[in-house]
Amino acid sequence: MLFCGAKGPRAPGSRSPHAAMKRGVLRSVVHIDSCAMKRSAFALIWALAICAQSETRANEAVVTAAPPPWDAQSRSVVDARQRTFQSGALTLSGTLYVPKIEGRIPAVIVLHAASSPTRDNPLYWHLVEMLPPLGIAVFVFDRRGSGESGGNLEDSDYAMLADDGISALRMLQRDHRIDPRRIGFWGLSQGGWLSLLAISRNAQAAFAISISAPMVTPDVQMNFAVANILRIKGFSQAEVDQAVATRTAVDDFQRGRRDRASAQSILDAATTKPWFVHTYLEKTFKDPDRSGWAREMRHDPMATLHAVRQPTLIIYGSADPWVPVQASLERLRASSARHPNVEVAVIAGADHAMATSVSPADQVDAALSARQAPQSAAYFGLLGAWLEKQRLARVR
């Protein structure tokens, strides 16, 4: 497993990854973990893809590199068509973007962040703009129960959502313009979990890209996020501790570690507190056998990763209030010997959506989450570098 840390210039408010990728000289602070990694050709492609991020730092250096040795043609002609496909009994709908170039090309299937269920969400625009000029098709579909797709999200689980992505892969394999051996998944947040899950469940998938998806279980992630939300909103540490204790009591009931009466008593006492509205808790809870959350919180992304053999890129933002990045890195490092196919990067200054100019208050505002989109030049560059390394991107 290769760990990389990337730090690049900001592109405030920019939705153009091409402009970000083609900026001038880039400077990166490099931390190299001599215990777990070595320099590779990946580190030499661009300054934005330099090894590595680690708790143990053997040395530090500032590296200056020339601009990227290629130019993505942002005016490429792209064929955009609506496509429907079957996933079990459901009909799902999306849009396929295919650059008009010769030969069969790779494709990326976008899997959904929890709060971004439809194909037109700004979170996915950069892929539609960035990848076709690099010779990569992009398929973005409406999640089941959203947009023009059938089904009901409440009746689904992570495995079903991952299987929707696999069904999309099978549909693309029948497209004469797509190389059936070079189709993979991209996902952010929950979509990152789904990308890993989908590729672990289908050996024909070629690669996975997981952005801002923690390597801890969902209950651990949500406790971390709620604690940060309350701190950002100005609550005291004592109030933060009370909120996390309340969430933990409910989760313990769902895991069979606490009886319903005591969990409900703790929850009842919390409902009158000013911080309760920020805890993502209801005023009561279902029995574990009827609770979707009880199923979700048992998902261990590390167990999924252990089943992945294909090339995988995992990226985090160092300023992400939703994800315990450090805890995720520690789990990844602990099993790095098992995952030579996995590369891990941390983008300095990037948040959960790979943006760099969004205030902490706006980052945790649920009403604004559907509007957030990547703007980090380092993220765009790192993504392009990895795709080029995998011989998926056509560059010159």
Regions picked out by a protein language model, each given a short descriptive name:
Residues 104-113:
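Short beta-strand element of the alpha/beta-hydrolase
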Residues 117-127, 143:
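The serine-hydrolase catalytic nucleophile loop
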Residues 63-101:
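N-terminal cap/lid segment of alpha/beta-hydrolase-fold proteins
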Residues 171-235:
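Primarily recognizes the serine-hydrolase "nucleophile elbow" in alpha/beta-hydrolase
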Residues 131-148:
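Conserved alpha/beta-hydrolase
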Residues 156-175:
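Alpha/beta-hydrolase active-site loop
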Residues 209-304:
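Accessory cap/linker subdomain of secreted extracellular hydrolases
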Residues 308, 314-316:
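Short beta-strand/loop motif that positions the catalytic acidic residue
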